[in-house]
């Protein structure tokens, strides 16, 4: 059995039930973490040990979780975080880096309030720049000190109906016809995690990220994801003759298939390569008995992407990120207008950088982004 590393209680908080202690655990070493995930309906792949281990291997983040459960007791709740120590973006706790969402694994509102109170004290004592949480629901009821900093759109497709019904809910012109076009054009499909599949996927990802004028994530990140998730991760490639035209990375967790990364060669987009990959993913998920296809988050200003996902018949919901700061008052509010000039300058530089340079920049920068 792996060694369990316990630290002193992170904090003591006053609540209606008296003084309560909040503890720190290592979710990668404490076997109670997997037991908590198995019992929690809110657990997702972003809570999993595989995701945490990939973050640790790639970026060197220290993973921890806050809980009101004492050592030796069953784990009743948990809030996982990664510690990011960056000279570029500051010292902060994030739950969790590069995750679309990460709901607090807490059933009782009182426990959540106590945990958030302890986090506020931690933020003040240790002078974290901020503590960020990415729940599926609002945290306003847990504390008056949390502030919303960014809003996204999340899409999820219900896979419980039969395939014919699911297909019938796709937008006729934008989705159904594109899938049929891909079939008529003779696009072929390949899946796996072999070296050739990996390299074709990464090449498509780099091309796409450059088109969007942002660096790609490091190669090592995708290799570690594949290693940590094993057979639950699939890379899917659409081919036109001898040319890879679209790629997608999906991860299966429990009854959900999650679309996490994708890329395409723009000169072949009219052939419907990405549409073919989405459709094959849905078919595979149905065959495996999965119930949900998580299409991931979209930025608020990505109107085209939001429309695209909605046309698959996916349900749309609001996703809000929250932060605590040492003062409890000031917070780095997400405001696109404030950062416009920085974003514009950076994207201009990225658009001119050769693919090799852009890839190197991604390897350097993503550790600081979190």
Please provide the spans of the model-predicted regions.
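A generic structural micro-environment signature
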Residues: 31, 43, 61, 87, ...
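Active-site/acyl-donor-binding loops of N-acyltransferases
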Residues: 2-17, 65, 83, 142-166, ...
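A conserved beta-strand-loop-helix scaffold within acyl/acetyltransferase catalytic domains
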Residues: 4-7, 14-73, 78-90, 135-270, ...
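Low-complexity, flexible helical/coil segments
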Residues: 59-61, 81, 101-106, 113-118, ...
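Glycine-rich loops and low-complexity Gly/Arg-rich segments
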Residues: 47-49, 92, 102-107, 129-130, ...
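Acyl-donor binding region in acyl/amide transferases
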Residues: 83-151, 171, 254-317
């Amino acid at each position: 059995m792996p060694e369990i590393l316990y630290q002193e209680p992170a904090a003591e908080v006053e609540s209606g039930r008296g003084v309560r202690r909040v503890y720190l655990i290592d979710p990668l070493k404490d076997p109670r973490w997997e037991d908590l995930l198995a019992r929690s309906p809110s657990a997702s792949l972003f809570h999993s040990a595989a995701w945490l281990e990939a973050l640790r291997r790639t970026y060197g983040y220290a993973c921890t979780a806050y809980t009101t459960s004492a050592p030796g007791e069953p784990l009743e709740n948990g809030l996982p975080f990664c510690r990011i120590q960056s000279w570029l973006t500051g010292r902060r706790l994030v739950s969790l880096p590069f995750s679309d969402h990460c709901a607090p694994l807490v059933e009782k509102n009182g426990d959540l309030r106590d945990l958030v109170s302890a986090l506020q004290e931690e933020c003040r004592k240790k002078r974290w720049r901020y503590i960020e949480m990415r729940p599926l629901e609002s945290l306003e009821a847990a504390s008056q000190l949390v502030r919303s900093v960014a809003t996204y759109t999340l899409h999820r497709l219900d896979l419980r109906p039969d395939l014919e019904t699911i297909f019938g809910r796709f937008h006729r012109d934008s989705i159904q016809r594109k899938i049929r076009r891909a079939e008529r054009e003779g696009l072929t499909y390949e899946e796996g995690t072999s070296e050739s599949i990996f390299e074709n996927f990464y090449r498509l990802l780099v091309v796409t990220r450059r088109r969007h004028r942002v660096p790609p994530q490091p190669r090592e990140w995708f290799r570690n994801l594949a290693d940590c998730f094993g057979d639950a991760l699939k890379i899917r490639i659409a081919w036109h003759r001898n040319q890879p035209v679209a790629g997608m990375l999906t991860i299966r967790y429990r009854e959900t298939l999650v679309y996490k990364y994708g890329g395409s060669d723009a000169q072949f987009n009219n052939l419907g390569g990405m549409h073919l990959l989405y459709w094959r993913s849905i078919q595979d998920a149905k065959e495996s008995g999965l119930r949900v296809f998580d299409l991931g988050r979209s930025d608020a200003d990505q109107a085209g992407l939001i429309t695209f996902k909605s046309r698959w018949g996916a349900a749309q919901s609001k996703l809000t990120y929250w932060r605590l700061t040492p003062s409890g008052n000031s917070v780095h509010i997400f405001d696109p207008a404030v950062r416009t000039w920085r974003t514009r300058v950076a994207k201009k530089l990225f658009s001119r950088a050769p693919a090799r340079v852009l890839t190197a920049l991604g390897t350097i920068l993503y550790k600081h982004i979190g």
